[in-house]
């Protein structure tokens, strides 16, 4: 059987079958059978099948990969990249929102402010973090942290992974739209360097609120859009089953968004996606983040602010 801890997507069935065959042969080998060459041969076939499959993913398949439950989350990047991380809680207006985590720590020896959505990896943690869908308190907390970082001249890193801001009645009553707008404006107005990385889903204003950065990076199989394919399908065709068609037409992939100038760079994922090797994904992402901050290191506050605002104005003019 394939690794019971690994969750295979529907389109990965051919790879799952090869992995299952390898596991069966390994069980035979453990009982004394000399089948090492056969195991190696099938292993090579599985690796090539995985490589070929992921080299030609459709936008809808990338959407599934971006949502994979074993994909590295915000907490994984914090553990792998940030030392001495100290999370801060509360928006000082209403309460705490654990869908959006933020705090201060050190990235490769230098002080940094980190904010981002945490989806959770278990049923309990997903409920705790509201599946990464932040309420107004989360975005107001992000504003509070960004203001602190700006005051103390500390760069800001945003790790984006959310289907969108939480659309509940309470969230709307407490000013969800205003909180998102305020967070977006704060990102644009920072006098310190800020880098955003789309690590999974970048959904609507909930993502943009912390992603209007000097450099926007995106993992190879992540997605970034104003609405989910399912919701777009329901609106356009009154039929959510056309999500695959919607995903194609919406241009939500990193490759499309780089071509449009919405993002600045695509970060390669390990063969088979980030969920197959989270540690390698985190390490590669860390290198790209360091390079992005290094590019911004010598820019003064006014230049950072002006270049960032101009960057997003240009995107609007180009795509408007």
Swiss-Prot record:
Q: One GO BP annotation here?
A: malonyl-CoA biosynthetic process
Which molecular-function annotation in GO is an example for this chain?
acetyl-CoA carboxylase activity
Q: Where in the cell is it found?
A: Cytoplasm
UniProt keyword annotations, A-Z? ATP-binding, Cytoplasm, Fatty acid biosynthesis, Fatty acid metabolism, Lipid biosynthesis, Lipid metabolism, Nucleotide-binding, Transferase
Sequence intervals crossing the membrane: none
Which reaction equation describes what this protein catalyses?
A: N(6)-carboxybiotinyl-L-lysyl-[protein] + acetyl-CoA = N(6)-biotinyl-L-lysyl-[protein] + malonyl-CoA
Q: Which GO terms describe its cellular component?
A: acetyl-CoA carboxylase complex
Pathway(s) the chain acts in: Lipid metabolism; malonyl-CoA biosynthesis; malonyl-CoA from acetyl-CoA: step 1/1
Q: What EC identifiers does the entry list?
A: 2.1.3.15
Pfam families assigned: ACCA
Query: InterPro entries, from UniProt?
Result: Acetyl_CoA_COase_a_su, ClpP/crotonase-like_dom_sf, COA_CT_C
Ranges for domain CoA carboxyltransferase C-terminal come to 42-295
Oligomeric and partner information: Acetyl-CoA carboxylase is a heterohexamer composed of biotin carboxyl carrier protein (AccB), biotin carboxylase (AccC) and two subunits each of ACCase subunit alpha (AccA) and ACCase subunit beta (AccD).
Similarity comment text for this entry: Belongs to the AccA family.
Note the PANTHER family from the entry.
Answer: ACETYL-COENZYME A CARBOXYLASE CARBOXYL TRANSFERASE SUBUNIT ALPHA, ACETYL-COENZYME A CARBOXYLASE CARBOXYL TRANSFERASE SUBUNIT ALPHA, CHLOROPLASTIC
Protein function: Component of the acetyl coenzyme A carboxylase (ACC) complex. First, biotin carboxylase catalyzes the carboxylation of biotin on its carrier protein (BCCP) and then the CO(2) group is transferred by the carboxyltransferase to acetyl-CoA to form malonyl-CoA.
**What's the protein called, per UniProt?**
Acetyl-coenzyme A carboxylase carboxyl transferase subunit alpha
Q: Kindly list the organism's lineage.
A: Bacteria, Pseudomonadati, Pseudomonadota, Alphaproteobacteria, Hyphomicrobiales
Name the gene: accA
